[in-house]
Amino acid sequence: VDMVCVELEDGIAPKDKAEARKKALALFDNPHSDDGVERIVRINSMREKFGIEDVSAILSTQTPPPALMMPKVRSPDEVIILDQLLSEAGHDTRLHVIIETNEGLEAAYEIAHSSDRMDAMFFGAIDMAPELRCDMAWEPLLYARSKVVHAAASAGLDVIDVPYLDLEDLDGMRVAAEQARMLGFSGKGSIHPKQIPILNEVFTPSADQIARARRTIAEFEKANTGLVVIDGKLIEKPVSVSYTHLTLPTT
């Protein structure tokens, strides 16, 4: 599923916050077509004045965004409170949470399990690196990334990696995306349309991968044992289970 995120947080100057909020919420005055694109609004932190104003405006509207992205979440309480407020307003808005603070990283597991509204966790390397006093490179942030992946997986959530910031280095972005995919990320954020084709290619299973996954699952079902040999390779049951997420509809 592709996502489009409307920005209200760091990308908007304080003097422009109110106008940006008004224009962002106006985008949802009329229903959107079912085009397979999830529309999200990234609000300001609920620990800040602008975040409280964002939430207040969303609770007051009859046509809220389908989903909200919560930045700089430090504890599950923030998610629980917003969930309760949305329920009281009668909104079925979904939630996406960014883990980008040291406190949030420590509470990642609890945050992942804090609301049935949650669909995904995002890893925010840009803010996380200075929090951890490390470089914003793959190796220094590997532990933090892994912890977010583990938390999201435990709750059955998608997990999205930070966007690649060098728009001209598409080869570098491909490498970073492949590293994220191998670590367990479901996708990677994008800050420019020209990044999207490569990201879709990296994170979308190929026809061969899907066919192999289906064949492996079928072989296990037929054999009804703990392991099978396919093309000379010994494959155990846990490997078959890991293939289930690749068996997507081909439509």
Segments from the language model and where they lie:
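Expand to "…catalyze enediolate/carbanion chemistry for C-C bond making/breaking, isomerization
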Residues: 1-246
